């Protein structure tokens, strides 16, 4: 796991789909390696997230890109979905963006 600058990431209103997946796994998107992108858990989350963003509308979208992984979504909307809808195990820092959740 990378040492994530949560102070920076939690202030960003939008992130790319790939960055959101990385953050949800405790990987620093700025330090993500090709090996990180090949991890099964990253690929599973990425595939599901792309489907949800483009076909379900459960996550607010800021902008789309022909490279789906580079489309931008709202981090708070993603966090709400990841924590409360699909119940992913995410870093506590990401959970602080979910309504009614306080940092522990």
Model-flagged regions — what are they?
Residues 1-104:
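Low-complexity, PEST-like segments
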């Amino acid at each position: 796991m990378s040492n994530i600058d949560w102070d920076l990431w939690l202030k960003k209103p939008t992130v790319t789909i790939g960055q959101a997946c990385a953050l949800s796994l405790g990987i620093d998107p700025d330090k993500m390696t090709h090996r990180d992108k090949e991890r099964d858990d990253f690929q599973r989350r990425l595939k599901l997230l792309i489907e949800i963003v483009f076909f379900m509308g459960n996550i607010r979208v800021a902008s789309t890109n022909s490279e789906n992984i580079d489309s931008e979504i709202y981090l708070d909307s993603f966090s709400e979905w990841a924590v409360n809808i699909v119940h992913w195990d995410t870093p506590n820092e990401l959970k602080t963006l979910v309504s009614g959740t306080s940092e522990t």
